[in-house]
Design a protein with these regions (language model features):
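Conserved, single-site charged/polar hotspot
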Residues: 3-661
């Protein structure tokens, strides 16, 4: 009888409470101010980046943020990746854990070994309330009213997302038996709803307050979606981010999915964000943001192109596009993003590199040592016409910490390494000889290397990156010479001898008009013809607008938003000189000459092998340090890109049908 009276009171509260309206407005307003990532609503491409996956998952994952979180549904498998927020929480430190009995030690949540050690129980009483996510405000009102009734018992209610609807759960029990004992009382409170005991699920995750261990929500991802968390934004100028315990800071949405396969059970974490946000999180971890702006622009375009080319690489296995490591591109989020990074990415927004209308695979490495290598010689297989070997005489590799190196190895040490670490068990005695059988065509990279032991047994290594990885404990690239006791090598040094003026061609990429009233130029700069000269206005924060959707001299007024200042109206003689195609502007660059010295390096023992090498990495495509050297000489990003990739074009990714690769 008591339970039925409580149920009636609760129903009246649900129907008549003013708090319902207030909470509804709160949830709606929070959702409205939260940054969303709808591909259809902006010009950005949303991508998925794996942060924790496969055997790297843990049973729980903690994050913090300043203003709390927005909670939503994040699809990872529908090809759209539209984040739909439906709730918010004010806590600024949360944990997402596998749905199971949990214990906590030193702030880390993990599976409890026994019921005696349970801190957060995995069994609950579930009510089939079946609210839609659009009715989350009503679900929240019911939850709060239910909490008021349960307060004396020490239990509380929380929502669970399950197959597209929101249900309510009560309690945190360590066993089914303890849940069953509490069931009659709890089920009787809302007897007008079907209820049941909910056991831990291998498709669910639990959202916890990190400090108290209180369950905030549970999420069952069996419908192919994931629990999405994004940092709640504020009206301040500072962006809101999510931070991990290792102090990496992330933009966009963090998507959590239960991963339970092949004896591994934990929480997979995927960062869903725009392509440009991703590029911002790659650039300062691959190169320094203090490098010249033209280098940053060139790298932004190369990184964006590589991401577009490899999009979906891990989809079939893990349901994300790219990993966050060197296998794809080194991505660590927004922690190092500064004004230079933002300007470089924004001024090249959407630009990618293509070859004959298809996205180019824009490989890059730290430095090449004065020569790149064709992609077919790196890993084998067919070569790409735009990834061929080039001399790069402008590269100051000898001035870089890892650009020029010397390594000495004893014959016995090398034998043990090759046998134990690399599996060359056919080698029986100390290494007596190392022979370079073949260099990659038009390159100084070693393509085929032979090791011969004291008994005449030999082992061959083919392809430049296999050569590099085989000796990876010692060498930084396959661009080397080797000798026993000593070796002769060449060393190049760049010397500036003067300056010259060149024509720098800058492409103008015109996007489709918006509402038939504006046109945006996506390029490094907008060139404005003033009364005195042709000047460049940065497109880092520029929109080019006209009344007709076209840009032409002497017609409708042209509005230019410079990086700083008010919107400026230009007309007549003060109009953009060319709306599309290429224009030629004078650019002063430094002239240089290369001085080559021939030297000899000697080992400490006449029996030891000595390697002298240049460059760091696989050597295909663009050299990061080489791109810096070209910018230091005065060249722009287009020249840099064309110096490393043959016969390519720079276009907006939206001009490529279905990201044709």
């Amino acid at each position: 009888m008591f339970a039925r009276i409580l149920a009636l009171v609760l129903a009246i509260l649900m129907l008549g409470s003013t708090a319902y309206y207030l909470i509804y407005m709160l949830v709606i307003s929070v959702a409205a101010e939260t940054p969303l990532y709808y591909t259809a609503a902006n010009d950005d491409l949303n991508i998925r980046v794996g942060l924790m996956y496969g055997d790297g998952v843990t049973e729980s994952f903690e994050t913090t943020t300043v203003h709390g979180y927005t909670v939503g549904v994040q699809p990872l498998q529908d090809g759209v990746y539209t984040y739909t927020p439906f709730w918010s929480i004010s806590g600024n430190r949360v944990v997402v854990a596998a749905d199971k009995n949990l214990t906590v030690k030193d702030g880390v949540y993990s599976a409890a070994k026994s019921t005696d050690a349970v801190y957060v129980g995995g069994y609950h009483i579930e009510f089939h309330t079946d609210y839609s996510i659009a009715d989350m405000a009503a679900a929240e009102q019911t939850r709060q009213n239910l909490d008021a009734v349960l307060s004396a018992s020490g239990m509380y209610a929380f929502p669970v997302y399950k197959n597209g609807v929101i249900r309510l759960r009560v309690g945190s029990f360590s066993t089914e038996a303890s849940a069953a004992a509490a069931y009659p009382y709890i089920a009787g409170i809302m007897s007008y709803f079907v209820s049941e005991i909910a056991a831990p699920s291998e498709t669910s995750v639990t959202l916890l307050d990190a400090e108290s261990g209180r369950i905030l929500m549970e999420y069952d991802s069996s419908d192919g979606t994931s629990l999405g968390l994004s940092a709640r934004d504020t009206l301040s100028a500072e962006n809101a981010y999510i931070k991990t315990p290792v102090q990496n800071v992330y933009d966009g949405v963090m998507a959590y999915t239960r991963y339970a396969e092949e004896g591994i059970d934990g929480v997979a974490v995927t960062n869903v964000l725009t392509l440009d946000q991703y590029v911002e999180g790659v650039l300062p971890y691959e190169i320094s943001s203090t490098w010249p702006m033209e280098t940053l622009k060139a790298f932004s375009i190369a990184a964006r192109s590589y991401a577009a080319y490899t999009l979906g690489r891990h989809d079939s296995t893990y349901h994300f596009d790219l990993c966050n490591g060197g296998h794809c591109q080194l991505y660590r989020g927004a922690g190092r993003v500064d004004r230079n990074v933002k300007d470089a990415v924004k001024s090249t927004h959407g630009l990618i590199i293509t070859y004959q209308g298809k996205i180019a695979s824009t490989y890059y490495s730290s430095s090449c040592g004065g020569n790149t290598v064709s992609i077919g010689d790196v890993w084998g297989g067919a070569s790409s016409p735009y990834l061929v070997a080039h001399e790069t005489p402008w590269e100051r590799y000898s001035e870089y910490t890892n650009g020029f190196w010397t390594v000495e190895i004893s014959p016995t040490e090398l034998l043990n390494y090759l046998r134990e670490q690399k599996g060359f068990t056919q080698l029986k005695g100390y290494i007596a000889d190392i022979s370079v059988l073949e260099y990659a065509p038009n390159s100084t990279y070693v393509k085929k290397l032979r090791f011969t032991d004291a008994y005449g047994n030999s082992a061959d290594v083919v392809n430049t990156d296999k050569v590099r990885s085989t000796l990876g404990a010692y060498l930084k690239s396959a661009n080397f010479v080797v000798g026993r006791g000593s070796v002769t090598y060449t060393l190049d040094k760049v010397e500036i001898v003067g300056e010259r003026v060149i024509d720098s061609k800058t492409q103008k990429h015109v996007l489709a008009p918006v509402n038939a009233a504006s046109a945006a130029l996506s390029s490094a700069g907008v060139f404005v013809q003033t009364a005195n000269s042709l000047e460049s206005a940065s497109l880092a924060s520029s929109l080019i607008l006209t009344d007709t959707g076209t840009v032409s001299a002497g017609s409708a007024p042209l509005y230019v938003q410079p990086a700083l200042g008010e919107l400026v109206s230009l007309a007549g003689a003060d109009a953009v000189s060319t709306p599309s195609g290429a224009i030629e502007l004078p650019r002063t660059v430094k002239e240089y000459t290369v001085v080559t010295e021939t030297k000899t390096a000697s080992a400490s023992s006449a029996t030891n092998f000595i390697f002298v090498g240049k460059g760091w990495g696989h050597g295909a495509g663009m050299s990061q340090y080489g791109a810096k050297d070209l910018a230091d000489l005065g060249y722009d990003y287009e020249h840099i890109i064309n110096a490393y990739f043959t016969d390519v074009e720079i276009v907006h990714y939206k001009t490529i049908p279905a990201l044709d690769r």
